[in-house]
Amino acid sequence: MDISIFLMVFLLFCVSLFLIFFVSCVKLSFFFVEWDFLSFKISVYFNSIMFSLILLLVTISVLVFSTYYLSGELNFNYYYFMLLVFVGSMFSLIFSSGCFSMLVSWDLLGISSFFLVLFYNNWDSCSGAMNTVLTNRLGDFFLFVFFSSTIFSSYYFLSLSFFCWLSSLMLLLASFTKSAQFPFSGWLPKAMSAPTPISSLVHSSTLVTAGLVLIMNFSEMILNKDVIMIIMVVGVFTMFFSSMAALVEEDLKKVVALSTLSQMGFSMLTVGIGLSFVSFIHLLSHALFKSCLFMQVGYLIHCSLGQQDGRNYSNLGNVPYFIQLQLLVTLFCLCGLVFSSGAVSKDYILEFFFSNFFMVVFACMFFFSVFLTFGYSYRLWKGFFMSFSRPVFCFSSSVVMNFLSLLLVLFSIFFIWWMNFNMLCMPCLFLYVDFFVPLFFVVMIMVVGFLCVKLLLKEFVYKFLVDFFAKGWVYGLKNYKFFDLFLGGINSLGVTFFSFTGFWSNSYMKSLYFNSVVIVLVLFFFLVWGCILSLKYALCKRMILAL
């Protein structure tokens, strides 16, 4: 692969960082063509720069990941070219501010996704590609009607109220088809027949986010009670049905895809309640940890000889510990646990939602949809590491593939928090001090105490009464083979002494006990960190109130 492409992408990444720090408060526009019937210009402002920075980071990771995941494919040059077209069309959609450039970028995004899903050229990929392109072409039609009705009503001064309502409806339908909202959600699980690097890019920061980016660019046009109600209802239905489907789905990639669909519904609901900027921040954090999650699942599929059925995965204790830790951290971010990047936007959205008055059925569906996020995340983790059969598993010899998503994991944990401290104005910090910290302390103390008493006590009772007492003392007193037991103990001790390191490293994560110990240690770390941060912000709040 040509190294100049990586250098070009890295240069764009550095330029995006420069623009964030020095022109974050300025909106720049560059005009290339300006005629009466055709205008081509790009706009550079804070949202487009931030999204392009995250897209560049994810694209670099996907490019490197593709060189290892698809190293033996014959059509790799075709894949690489279509991937660059796909990413370039998303960049063009982000920075475009004219009808012509936006339509061209929108069409290129759907067409390139068709060729990428069609990469493996089998029955599943052909069916998924056709489903994807037909649904996206329907969205292209809605977007064309939206721009046409807007221009027509502005030129001929017809019934503006009717045309504004029609334009808003076409805008919603176009964004619903591209972001796979209800009832246009069928193409997203079928698009999982594409290679896993493409799934990582599509479900993090490109195709499914394009509809939300479009509706955020025209957020002033949806300030209508009926339009907002449609957005909220569609977002809640998408969350609920995708979360329920993720609980019963067995295909690993489809489970992660349905979790993406649930988060897109969550972001659409956030736009509906009037928090467009908060929804944008949630998209940024989701792009980071979801691309990392897809890479880790793709690594496990690649090492398991392409096996995607979750029922055939279990007891993957031989997976490198760093991959297991990354998978756990990304699932924490997906659930929006405290002091992760997902919590920066998710907790504020939940607080804002439950501080308003909605219908009981509507609020219950939203609550259960959020709660089911923990359900399918735990099911995914349990299916990997907490069962008792053994799959065929081949390790990757590449260190780069094992540690590729490290940068995405670090950004998933610290980047949004750093932005919230330095650049954003999201009042989510005081939520922890006023409400979440006491509740967090109580819940964490109860959970840690229950796990320690339940697991450690059961382990001690089993090891002492069942294993050690029955096999050692009772066997020796009954058969009086003290000398044989003594020699056998010496032999066993010697073998254990020489093979302890290898045996421990291979069997560390195979049992429920050790998994529970690791989870308890991670939760204890979060507890200590929460105590320190809560004390710090409590002091800051008292100083602010005193002033």
From Swiss-Prot:
Top class in the EC scheme: translocase
Name this polypeptide is given: NADH-ubiquinone oxidoreductase chain 5
Similarity-based family: Belongs to the complex I subunit 5 family.
GO biological process, one term: ATP synthesis coupled electron transport
GO MF, one example: NADH dehydrogenase (ubiquinone) activity
Main location group: mitochondrion
GO cellular component: mitochondrial inner membrane
Known EC number: 7.1.1.2
Cited function: Core subunit of the mitochondrial membrane respiratory chain NADH dehydrogenase (Complex I) that is believed to belong to the minimal assembly required for catalysis. Complex I functions in the transfer of electrons from NADH to the respiratory chain. The immediate electron acceptor for the enzyme is believed to be ubiquinone.
Mitochondrion in keyword set: yes
Transmembrane segments: 3-23, 45-65, 80-100, 101-121, 132-152, 198-218, 227-247, 264-284, 319-339, 352-372, 399-419, 430-450, 460-477, 485-505, 512-532
Key words of the record: Electron transport, Membrane, Mitochondrion, Mitochondrion inner membrane, NAD, Respiratory chain, Translocase, Transmembrane, Transmembrane helix, Transport, Ubiquinone
Zinc keyword on record: no
Membrane-related topology note: Multi-pass membrane protein
Subcellular location: Mitochondrion inner membrane
InterPro entries: ND/Mrp_TM, NU5C-like
Domain of life per record: Eukaryota
Pfam families, alphabetized: Proton_antipo_M
Reactions this protein catalyses: a ubiquinone + NADH + 5 H(+)(in) = a ubiquinol + NAD(+) + 4 H(+)(out)
